Design a protein with these regions (language model features):
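Nucleic-acid-binding small beta-barrel platforms of the OB/S1 family
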Residues: 1-154, 230-244
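Short, contiguous, well-structured surface segments enriched in hydrophobic/aromatic residues
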Residues: 149-169
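A short, polar/proline- and glycine-enriched secondary-structure boundary/capping micro-motif
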Residues: 93, 110-112, 181-185, 217-220
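Structured beta-strand/turn binding interfaces of compact recognition modules in eukaryotic regulators
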Residues: 89-96, 163-165, 173-177, 195-197, ...
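Short nucleic-acid-contacting surface segments enriched for D/E, G, S/T with interspersed K/R
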Residues: 81, 178-195
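Fungal eukaryote-biased detector of long internal structured cores
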Residues: 166, 180, 186-188, 201, ...
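OB-fold/S1-family single-stranded nucleic acid-binding modules
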Residues: 102-108, 199-234
Length: 244
């Protein structure tokens, strides 16, 4: 079998957005002889997960990339189901189970290099992940940039802003908990597959483990900007409510 059809079939088998023939041809021809198929799959996967779905720069096959149906996305539309699989990317994620004031206090503590454990204030360990342990007197820039609110437990509910290939944006809410969604787990620019049958109610996508498949990935510039501006955005929302 020709290498390009093999590569395309392998990428589609793991639910990635359909790559363009031009992208695959360039990738295969970049070295002579071509790299082994597993290496090509890994490279193509990384590129596809890091691209902007709404401006894919010829990486994706637009003819095989359906958008969210406009009728279902209307705020006054009643419940509907997606008739086909749709790839989207994450623009925002928020834990609705934690108040915005609590999120602000946690982020301000992280900015000071602190985090609370029970009643004890401790220093954030260098390079610690959001749900990782903390240690005294040792913090790092990654902790300050990425550490966020509370651990996403089994009862947490998250709201996301999703974008399709045409740039349409829509809110999505966990109807049932999805382990791979959460602050510190979900990256900005991450790709997700909304499977056919996904319910959309009043313009909001309802996410369940059966219909939402997180694929991973990240658009670095988007994620950095989101993380750095998150504290101010929370303050703006809270401040706006109190000035009305």
């Amino acid at each position: 079998m020709d290498l390009i059809p093999q590569l395309r079939a392998s990428l589609l088998a793991i639910s990635l957005p359909a790559p363009s023939t031009a992208f695959l041809t360039t990738l295969v021809a970049s070295r002579s002889p071509p790299p082994p198929l597993p290496s090509l799959i890994a490279t193509a996967k990384a590129r596809l997960l890091a691209c902007d779905l709404a401006a894919p720069a010829a990486l994706l096959d637009a003819a095989m990339l359906p958008a969210l149906p406009a009728a279902a996305m209307a705020a006054d539309a009643s419940s509907a189901r997606l008739s086909r699989d749709v790839h989207v990317q994450v623009l925002d994620v928020e834990n609705l189970s934690v108040s915005r004031w609590d999120q602000i206090e946690e982020l301000e503590a992280v900015a000071r290099g602190e985090r609370t454990r029970g009643r004890q204030v401790v220093r954030v360990a260098a390079g610690a992940d959001d749900d990782a342990a903390v240690a005294p007197d040792n913090d790092g820039p990654r902790s300050r940039r990425d550490a966020v609110a509370a651990v996403a437990g089994p009862s947490a509910t998250h709201r996301l802003v999703l974008q399709d290939c045409r740039g349409n944006r829509v809110y999505a809410v966990e109807l049932r908990r999805i382990d791979r969604i959460g602050i510190g787990k979900t990256n900005i620019g991450e790709k997700m597959l909304l499977r056919a049958g996904t319910v959309v109610a009043r313009g909001t996508v309802l996410l369940t483990p059966e219909t939402c498949l997180p694929l991973g990935g990240r658009i670095e510039a988007w994620h950095e900007a989101w993380a750095e501006s998150r504290l101010q955005r929370l303050k703006d929302v809270v401040g706006g409510r109190h000035t009305r």
